[in-house]
């Protein structure tokens, strides 16, 4: 991953403003668009210690995740009082297993993730700088089974007004990254500089967007 020390340091210092304490309401609202059923497998890239993993595990028999930070993965299981089975996969990866959950530690690009029916990306693509996003998406495509679907949550703002992460990934870039896939914009939540949080960040506009991305069967 690009600049892994940045993320290791964030977790070590507990500087995790990107972490939501509750299940993402956008996941709850739009997951049905992926046509889920219990037998369909799910992958959550760069999953951190997301509460979304718990929610997804109640609806699917297999939920895989990958997270660079071992601190995050251990915290996830400890905070839920889960005792996972831990398997050393290689010098780079460990696998934490508990019921429906299979969480790998280490690099997203080399973790031995199995292909899945559905992918949920809430804070992964937007965490990556522009120079690595195409490589990230290519790996995502490799892990998606034919006919599979991706629920993607992104941000769109003027990148010159804030350094990121999270980075701005506008629709034009989504169209380029997922060329050949069916792309549907499900939701667009737009705020301008009259919104106090947006003004505080020095942004003129800010949009959170939800996409359904579908591969051919």
Curated annotation (Swiss-Prot):
Catalytic activity: S-adenosyl-L-methionine + a thiopurine = S-adenosyl-L-homocysteine + a thiopurine S-methylether
Pfam families with a match to the protein in the record: TPMT
Gene Ontology molecular-function annotations: thiopurine S-methyltransferase activity
Keywords: Cytoplasm, Methyltransferase, S-adenosyl-L-methionine, Transferase
KW Zinc-finger (keyword) present: no
GO CC terms: cytoplasm
Subcellular location: Cytoplasm
Record-linked InterPro entries: SAM-dependent_MTases_sf (IPR029063), Thiopur_S-MeTfrase_Se/Te_detox (IPR022474), Thiopurine_S-MeTrfase (IPR025835), TPMT (IPR008854)
Record-listed S-adenosyl-L-methionine binding positions: 11, 46, 67, 122
Enzyme class: transferase
GO biological process terms held by the UniProt record: methylation; response to metal ion
Similarity comment: family membership: Belongs to the class I-like SAM-binding methyltransferase superfamily. TPMT family.
Protein name: Thiopurine S-methyltransferase
């Amino acid at each position: 991953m690009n600049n892994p020390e940045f993320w290791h340091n964030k977790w070590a210092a507990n500087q995790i403003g990107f972490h939501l304490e509750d299940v993402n309401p956008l996941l709850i609202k739009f997951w049905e668009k992926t046509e889920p059923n219990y037998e369909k497998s799910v992958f959550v890239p760069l999953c951190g210690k997301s509460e979304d993993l718990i929610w997804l595990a109640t609806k699917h028999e297999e939920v895989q995740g990958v997270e660079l930070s071992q601190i995050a993965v251990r915290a996830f299981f400890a905070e839920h009082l889960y005792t996972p089975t831990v398997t050393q996969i290689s010098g780079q990866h460990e696998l934490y297993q508990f019921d429906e959950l299979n969480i790998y530690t280490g690099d997203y690009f080399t973790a031995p993730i199995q292909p899945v029916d559905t992918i949920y990306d809430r804070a992964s693509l937007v965490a990556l700088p522009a120079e690595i996003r195409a490589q990230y998406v290519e790996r995502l495509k490799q892990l998606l089974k034919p006919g599979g679907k991706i629920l993607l949550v992104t941000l769109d703002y003027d990148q010159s007004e804030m350094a990121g992460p999270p980075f701005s990934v506008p629709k034009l870039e989504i169209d380029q990254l997922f060329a050949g896939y069916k792309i549907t914009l499900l939701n667009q939540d737009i705020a301008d500089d009259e919104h106090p949080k947006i003004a505080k960040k020095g942004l003129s506009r800010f949009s959170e967007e939800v996409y359904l991305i579908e591969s051919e069967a």
